[in-house]
């Protein structure tokens, strides 16, 4: 038996880090990715397409998204589509899952108990749903397979052994431990929630098929799962991402003018595509007229978007602080106050001094990066 598994597409996600136009483009790209997944399911002649939750955003989905999903999955018939709602697309009153009149080839699991769906070749799919956005318990607690054959789990949850390897801030929804899968009688579990792919002995996280934020790098895709007669599985990961999100660090040390910084950014991003976040670091010469928004606006055509942020970025000191501290001027008083402050670290002290002095000198452009 062959399945194509994916999860965590997050249709209609806001992409808060992106500008409105680019966020709109990224949301459209997620639809293209789902269409790519569906074509792959047909090309590989799988027995079913499975999704383990977070297919869309419950708080943001539109009627257009509902019709798109209905028609996209209906077009796959008679290929079966199995959906196990997660915490972002939980099943309940007002959910897209309840509003859509699905075609006969689509099955939506709708309870927090693992429910059997008999399949072909002696295989049973056991699926469950989140029915609230939070506080969903462990699906495997008190669950035990009660029949013969091959048994595959399909649900959205947090395998506790891998939680620390995921991006910080990931909430442990429906937490469980990997050894519970085998002890419950399941041969394997096809999962969702973790955006970083995991190939466990008895479980598979496909990862999100298209990056939603920076840091979600590497190959993004769906997983072709072959189930053998003894319940063992083989996996093939297939890239389906429409877009990419790249993180780049650029050292600006020694750059003496704005265009020199632009040139370094251009070199660092020349071979990249999609969205790129550039982190500037190093020591910037004090006379560089650098505006982050101007750099972002000059993004080359081969990039979808360019975001600039500061990392460990400092300004080369060009002021004689000892001499300035002796002045009976506003500048002198400012320098004395900052040097005598006990609440600042040395790095903070340098930033405050350079920023303040440049502002007093009417060189206010640097306020953007400090």
Q: Where are these predicted regions, by residue range?
A:
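Structural beta-sheet core signal
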Residues: 5, 51, 83, 153, ...
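Amphipathic, non-transmembrane alpha-helical secondary structure
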Residues: 31-42, 67-70, 140-144, 259-266
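N-terminal active-site segment of His-dependent metallophosphoesterases
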Residues: 1-68, 350, 354-370
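His/Asp/Glu-rich metal-coordinating catalytic cores
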Residues: 48, 57-204, 208-221, 226
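Domain-start "cap" segments at the beginnings of catalytic or binding domains
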Residues: 1-22, 220, 226-248
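Glycine-rich phosphate-binding loop signature in dinucleotide/nucleotide-binding domains
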Residues: 41-45, 146-148, 269-272
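Accessory, non-catalytic peripheral segments of nucleic-acid enzymes
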Residues: 232-370
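Residue-level signal for alpha-helix termini/capping positions
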Residues: 27, 42-43, 74-77, 270
């Amino acid at each position: 038996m062959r399945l194509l598994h994916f999860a965590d597409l997050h249709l209609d996600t806001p992409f808060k880090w992106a500008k409105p136009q680019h966020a709109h483009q990224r949301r459209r790209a997620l639809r293209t990715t789902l269409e790519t997944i569906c074509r792959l399911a047909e090309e590989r002649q799988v027995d079913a397409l499975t999704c383990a939750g977070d297919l869309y955003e419950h708080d943001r989905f539109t009627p257009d998204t509902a019709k798109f999903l209905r028609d996209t999955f209906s077009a796959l018939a008679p290929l079966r589509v199995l959906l196990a709602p997660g915490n972002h697309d939980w099943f309940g009153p007002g959910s897209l899952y309840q509003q859509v009149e699905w075609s006969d080839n689509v099955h939506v699991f709708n309870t927090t108990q693992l429910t059997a769906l008999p399949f072909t070749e002696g295989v049973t799919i056991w699926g469950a749903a989140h029915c609230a956005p939070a506080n969903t318990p462990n699906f495997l607690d008190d669950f035990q397979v009660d029949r013969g054959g091959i048994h595959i789990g399909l649900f959205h949850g947090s395998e506790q052994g891998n939680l620390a390897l995921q991006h910080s801030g990931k909430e442990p929804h429906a937490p469980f431990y990997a050894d519970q899968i085998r002890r419950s009688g399941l041969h394997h579990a096809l999962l969702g929630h973790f955006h970083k792919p995991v190939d466990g002995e008895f479980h598979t996280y496909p990862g999100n098929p298209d990056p939603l934020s920076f840091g979600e790098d590497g190959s993004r895709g769906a997983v072709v799962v072959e189930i053998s007669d003894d319940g063992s599985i083989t996996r093939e990961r297939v890239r389906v991402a429409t877009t990419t999100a790249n993180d780049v660090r650029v050292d600006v040390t020694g750059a003496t003018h704005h265009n020199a910084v632009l040139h370094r950014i251009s070199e660092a991003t020349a071979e990249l595509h999609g969205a790129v976040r550039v982190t500037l670091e190093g020591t910037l010469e004090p006379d560089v007229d650098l505006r982050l928004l101007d750099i972002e606006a000059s993004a080359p055509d081969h990039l979808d978007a360019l975001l600039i942020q500061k990392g460990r970025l400092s300004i080369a000191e060009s002021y004689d602080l000892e001499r300035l501290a002796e002045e009976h001027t506003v500048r002198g008083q400012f320098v004395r106050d900052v040097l005598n402050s006990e609440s600042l670290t040395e790095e903070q002290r340098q930033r405050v001094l350079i920023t303040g002095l440049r502002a007093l000198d009417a060189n206010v452009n640097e306020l953007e990066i400090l």
